[in-house]
Swiss-Prot record:
Gene name of the encoded protein: tpiA
Function: Involved in the gluconeogenesis. Catalyzes stereospecifically the conversion of dihydroxyacetone phosphate (DHAP) to D-glyceraldehyde-3-phosphate (G3P).
Record-listed E.C. numbers: 5.3.1.1
CDD domains associated with the record: TIM
GO biological process: gluconeogenesis; glycolytic process
Keyword Transmembrane: no
Protein name, UniProt field: Triosephosphate isomerase
Subunit structure: Homotetramer; dimer of dimers.
Gene Ontology, cellular component aspect: cytoplasm
GO molecular function, one term: triose-phosphate isomerase activity
Length: 213
């Protein structure tokens, strides 16, 4: 199934009361798996939306205990959160932390969309078999040039690399229209990771529909 993760980041347009309004307007798609990644303080509202799947934007490899400021998988699961982004370009981690967090998540049945910025990282981390590898070149994030246009050959190679491990690939950075999505799918990607193109749009639902329908 085609997967779309919408990362709300800390954008004011989808924060606090705006988050509730944003999610309330989302349509249900029969052939698309839609996942929303809200700001951490909005995750407690996830239980109000039983028909929406939620990821955290980050998670740590700790459990319950004396871990000030950390985000435990167990705590997220108690709120109905089913997975998390990990190693996003705005929240990068070291290799040891990535490995330990992915392994802990797998033990608990918690999904991880592991973000990578290069083919080398895709090679290194696909062997961990996260739920998804999300390829986002840092220099294209938030821009108007899509990754499918700027780096099509790298997407194809990452799809091949991850395919040998059975890991689906999402692509992000600069995805703004249906043509960008179609190019990504033609290159073998199984979904997209989007943010500002939807969240900061004057009509987020229309923008989302333009990518999906």
């Amino acid at each position: 199934m085609f997967t779309v993760i919408v990362n709300l980041k800390n954008y004011a347009e989808a924060n606090g009361k705006n988050f509730v309004e944003f999610v309330s307007k989302l349509p249900k798609y029969d052939s698309v798996r839609l996942i929303i990644a809200p700001a951490i303080l909005d995750l407690h509202n996830a239980h109000e939306f039983r028909n929406v799947e939620f990821f955290s934007q980050h998670v740590d490899d700790v459990g319950y205990g004396p871990y000030t400021g950390h985000i435990a998988i167990e705590s997220l699961m108690n709120y109905g959160i089913i997975g998390s982004l990990l190693n996003h370009s705005e929240r990068r981690l070291g290799e040891d932390k990535i490995i330990s967090t992915v392994k802990k998540a797998q033990m608990l049945g918690f999904e991880i969309a592991l973000c990578v910025e290069s083919m080398e990282e895709a090679k290194r981390y696909s062997a961990l078999k996260p739920s998804f590898i999300a390829y986002e070149p840092k220099e294209l994030i938030g821009g108007n040039v899509s990754v499918s246009t700027a780096k099509p050959e790298i997407i194809s190679e990452i799809v091949d690399i991850c395919g040998t491990e059975g890991v689906p690939v999402l692509v992000g950075a600069g995805i703004k229209n249906r043509q960008d999505v179609r190019k990504s799918l033609d290159l073998g990607a199984q979904g997209i990771l989007v943010s500002s193109g939807v969240v900061k749009s004057p009509d987020p639902v229309r923008s989302l529909n333009s990518l999906i329908k």
